[in-house]
Amino acid sequence: QFPSARSASWTLDDVESPRNSGWFLCALAARRAITFLEEQPEVDPDRLGVYGHSMGGKLTVMTAVDSRIKAAAPSCGGISDRYNDSELFRATLGDDVSLKQISCPIMFLSPANDFHGRIGDLPVAVNEIRSTDWRVTCSPHHNHQDTPAYEVATLLWFDQHLKQTFTMPQTPKTSLQLS
């Protein structure tokens, strides 16, 4: 019951409600996991990041709204769930709802031909986030996966924003002059 807020005999609410979606429960669990982690003596609560692939990419976006998250990297998800049939679902659990609240540094991993986190939705997602510290990696012909050559960007992103042991190169300036 992930892409639905409809009621069923086993859902929390007997009317259409975001709480009936598996996304609500997963996001709640992720927020509780953050609370658990920040209470552990071996964890620095000021250096928490979140990464997820596919459905985990959507969950990464839903979790990155939490101010305790200092860096995020959604892979193949979290940008395209905005066309659900339910107006209530779109207004509460659509990717744009979470993206508009993200202020932490975020690295989008988006293969060029992914069927789940569609690259055509990436410019809209980037424009929706509040963070000005963002990057995108796009791998050609990798469908719904990220391979080590592209995944390394995630590790470096977290090294920069959580460990302060790396600095990503600046985005080069580009221009186009038509004569």
Set out the residue ranges of the language-model regions:
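Alpha-helical scaffolding within the catalytic cores
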Residues: 58, 86-97, 120-124
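Cap/lid segment of the alpha/beta-hydrolase catalytic domain
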Residues: 1-28, 83-88
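Primarily recognizes the serine-hydrolase "nucleophile elbow" in alpha/beta-hydrolase
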Residues: 32-90
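Surface beta-strand/loop "capping" patches
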Residues: 149-150, 156-179
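Short beta-strand/loop motif that positions the catalytic acidic residue
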Residues: 102, 108-110
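Acidic catalytic loop of the alpha/beta-hydrolase fold
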Residues: 112-117, 144-145
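Short alpha-helix in the alpha/beta-hydrolase fold that links the catalytic acid
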Residues: 104, 118-127
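Catalytic histidine neighborhood in serine/cysteine hydrolases
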Residues: 129-145
